[in-house]
């Protein structure tokens, strides 16, 4: 060969030019770099399209729910291998060849107790998704699966709420508290006691609480006894420590105490050994004979330990209730991905659970994706 320039075929030049013009796909994901304070939560830019199997779907996330459990995950309460984000809502971007009951463009609710949903693109299986009903916003959709499912199981499965009974809902202005109140109102003539700071009393009354109680300056047990000397039929307790014993003491015979959290441990951005020790020191203990003699029941609830098929059944019931106008998720505020630390700080500073439902709003500026490894179905 001489020193003459070797030219590429015209077809090869065109392919090269097209490749150079293709935008690089990237998306944001919130990750946990260790456990501890707010500095451990970071926004990372991921490059490329997530791999999709034939039985999976790719979802472009529009909103993510922030729950109290995410604060505990950040603090390391569940170990070092848990991921943030258990619920979100978005639009189906692509589907695998074997998927027949979802299509591109479907708006869906997504739940994954193992976390990992705080990302703009997520791959999941169909059984973890539920079609959004007409009229539901993405923020509402990202606020229904955890709080309302937890409240539904505790009230109807564990406590078996019946007409003319009474219930104490701690942190009634919180995500679970709002959901529990609305679900209690579906049963005839239920008396609802709800604890909240004074600034939230009007809100929880509008939501259905019969008797708001200021837990910040008053003894809530004494306040309940003033109105219901015999106590209440049900106590929903997310607090832990001494409040568990207090709640048990408030029960009528045949009453039920449902424990589902330990909010008293979250007193600072980082996990507090002192707070944990205080909760442990005041932990609720009762033996079988004492329980029999008390004529009461104690239940412990963990959404992650609930049968997935039952969870799916409950979510479908909740969607039906939403369609009927019987429940309505309340979104307190919307934050961008970059504000995740501020959102967590705000949740803790406003008495942790004392929120409605939160959303982390993802950006909507990503280019349209072209997924060639799976079939897209527009039907």
Curated annotation (Swiss-Prot):
CDD domains: MDR3 (cd08275). InterPro entries: ADH-like_N, GroES-like_sf, NAD(P)-bd_dom_sf, PKS_ER, Quin_OxRdtase/zeta-crystal_CS, SV-ATPase_mito-regulator. It is an enzyme of class 1 (oxidoreductase). SUPFAM superfamilies: GroES-like, NAD(P)-binding Rossmann-fold domains. One of its GO terms (biological process) is negative regulation of mitochondrial fusion. This is Synaptic vesicle membrane protein VAT-1. The keyword Phosphoprotein applies. Signal peptide: none annotated. Synthesized in the neuronal cell bodies and transported to the terminals. Each vesicle contains approximately 28 molecules of VAT-1. Its EC number is 1.-.-.-. Keywords: Cytoplasmic vesicle, Membrane, Oxidoreductase, Phosphoprotein, Synapse. It is found in: Cytoplasmic vesicle, Secretory vesicle, Synaptic vesicle membrane. It comes from Tetronarce californica (Pacific electric ray). GO terms for cellular component: mitochondrial outer membrane; synaptic vesicle membrane. The modification Phosphoserine is found at residue 273. Belongs to the zinc-containing alcohol dehydrogenase family. Quinone oxidoreductase subfamily. May play a central role in the functions mediated by specific classes of synaptic vesicles. The keyword Membrane applies. Cholinergic synaptic vesicles. One of its GO terms (molecular function) is zinc ion binding. Its main location: membrane. It holds the Pfam family ADH_zinc_N_2.
